[in-house]
Amino acid sequence: MTHEWGSAPEFVGPRHELREKLLLDLFRSGSPGPHVLNAGAGTGSFSLRLAENGFDVTSVDASSAAVEVLRRRVPGEVAQADVTTLPFADAAFDAAVLGEVLEHVEDDRGALEEVARVLRPGGVLAVSVPADPKRFGPSDRWAGHVRRYSRQELLSACQAGGFTVERCRAWGFPFAALYHRYLYERRLDRHGASAPRRWERPALAVLSAILQVDRLFVGVERGALGYLLLATRD
């Protein structure tokens, strides 16, 4: 499978699946209301998770190709828009998700301020971003990232954008980080974001099971791939 970030697809595999499961767990722990904005939804894998868990999801992406897939694939409203200029009224949503989005946006504070605008006071925001600016490299440039985040940079951006941070957790140690370094990046170099070939699929299923062990180590900073953050609108 692939999905789009702008004009570049991303390979969806075990790392992606683990991150989405962890992000959903964190999001649900904030007791969000029913009306949820998924901003930067790609082709909708997280929107589908939200819908399956009973949320009324509005999915937004800047990519016309992604929006075309979203309209075929996910329930609820779909809109094409940049996260810094959302086409919704003030306080239109109970909760919002920015899953692997802010690292693509030059004006991340502006994006957070815009999401805060469309959330009701006290509304829940869940965020995931890649960690450790020192690890910025070819796979980030290929994916269209403009940055990776330190913990403090992420906290500061969210606070400046109008949010109170409730929790911020590192994720990805140990197995997802090893997968990223020794399998994901090498596969990207060789095959780009092509769909997994038939012989790869059983191996990916096994890897998905192995990576679930990382749930036991959420919060460990060493070697973390990213951060998961839960906040409420001021």
Language model features with spans:
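Short, glycine-/aromatic-enriched active-site segment of Class I SAM-dependent methyltransferases
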Residues: 125-147, 151-156
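Conserved S-adenosyl-L-methionine
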Residues: 163-174
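Conserved N-terminal segment of class I S-adenosyl-L-methionine
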Residues: 1-89, 95-99, 112, 151, ...
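Short aromatic-enriched loop/helix-cap "lid" or pocket-rim segments at secondary-structure transitions
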Residues: 137-141, 177-183
